[in-house]
């Protein structure tokens, strides 16, 4: 997590050491990446390889404390949609709204399908429960037909796990 005002999470919370988890919920296997985990494609891929069928990303992200004019909402949204597309599965991204200590959280919670198409979304200051119907069987077929998991080459990925 970056240093600076608005990014003090690492001083109050410790990351868990039991890895990512996938749960059965209402007939679907869900994987959850919390806040900072959302920026790493490895999180999405590991959850997918563990059998997740839907990726959830609850977060609190907004304006940059040192540069209030910098709006990273488009970059955040593209990263989340990238997880959906590269893992061929729906993503549910829930983001905080409001202002605290000078940081404005930009909302824009959304649900997208495995193609990255938006199924439901809120604006910058809207809150509530987004609802959408997901066709998990169609997503499974899509995942199988693209071969992203079948054609992986793990023998080439060792560097990603080494310290820099």
Residue ranges and their predicted role:
Residues 77-81, 90:
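Membrane-associated lipid acylation/remodeling enzymes share a hydrophobic transmembrane-juxtamembrane segment
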Residues 90-164:
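C-terminal beta-strand edge segments of enzyme domains
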């Amino acid at each position: 997590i970056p240093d600076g005002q608005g990014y003090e999470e690492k001083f109050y919370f410790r990351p868990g050491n039991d890895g990512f988890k996938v749960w059965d919920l209402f007939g679907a296997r869900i994987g959850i990446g919390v806040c900072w985990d959302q920026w790493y494609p490895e999180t999405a891929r590991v959850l997918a390889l563990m059998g997740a069928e839907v990726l959830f990303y609850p977060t609190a992200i907004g304006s940059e404390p040192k540069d209030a004019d910098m709006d990273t909402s488009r970059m955040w949204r593209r990263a989340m949609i990238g997880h959906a597309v590269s893992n061929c599965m729906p993503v549910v991204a829930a983001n905080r709204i409001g202002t605290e200590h000078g940081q404005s959280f930009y909302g824009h919670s959304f649900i997208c399908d495995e193609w990255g198409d938006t199924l439901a979304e809120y604006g910058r200051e809207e809150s509530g429960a987004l609802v959408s119907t997901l066709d998990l069987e169609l997503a499974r077929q899509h995942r199988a037909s693209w071969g992203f998991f079948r054609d992986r080459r793990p023998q080439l990925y060792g560097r990603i796990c080494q310290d820099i």
